[in-house]
Curated annotation (Swiss-Prot):
Protein name according to UniProt: Ras-related protein RABG3c
Any single GO CC term annotated in Swiss-Prot or TrEMBL for this entry: plasma membrane
Lipid group attachment sites (S-geranylgeranyl cysteine): C204, C206
GO biological process, one term: protein transport
Entry-annotated residues carrying Cysteine methyl ester: C206
Chain's role: Intracellular vesicle trafficking and protein transport.
Entry keywords, A to Z: Cell membrane, GTP-binding, Lipoprotein, Membrane, Methylation, Nucleotide-binding, Prenylation, Protein transport, Transport
Membrane topology, record value: Lipid-anchor
Amino acid sequence: MASRRRVLLKVIILGDSGVGKTSLMNQFVNRKFSNQYKATIGADFLTKEVQIDDRIFTLQIWDTAGQERFQSLGVAFYRGADCCVLVNDVNVMKSFENLNNWREEFLIQASPSDPENFPFVVLGNKTDVDGGKSRVVTEKKAKSWCASKGNIPYFETSAKDGVNVDAAFECIAKNALKNEPEEEVYLPDTIDVAGARQQRSTGCEC
């Protein structure tokens, strides 16, 4: 049986503990949201096939722990990333102020070949909380920071309601694709079949 080629796009999600990284990933991949908070231990990832310009790509999304004691694991998980997503909670100023620390840590540990042009996307999450009355990070402030870092794309999201989640990940996928080398990952059919079974088990709706 003939084999086919597929491009794997690796995306890393970073941000303080509790900003909604896991919820954003689950909302995008599985269309699910849980009010029960459970801290990520180390790192985890989900995959989803996305279509860009009539081509199918596999998006591998890594959800990393926000706790400091796990940050030393960064090198192993960050290497080979095609895009980095920085997430903050619009209701917690400290999570916004820490975005620069997360960005710098990623660039140091991932060591991308062209750090000046490496693609980042920023998500201001939890816009649904208290009807928006609790927010302390304004859209203007967030966009100003993004502009100062090379015009990083910015989206305001609600993992709970699904607001802007698809649009954000479409942008993430396109930016990851721009950074992906021309060479494609070669996957034999035997591995592809196993991957398809794994995908069905996650409940992914592509």
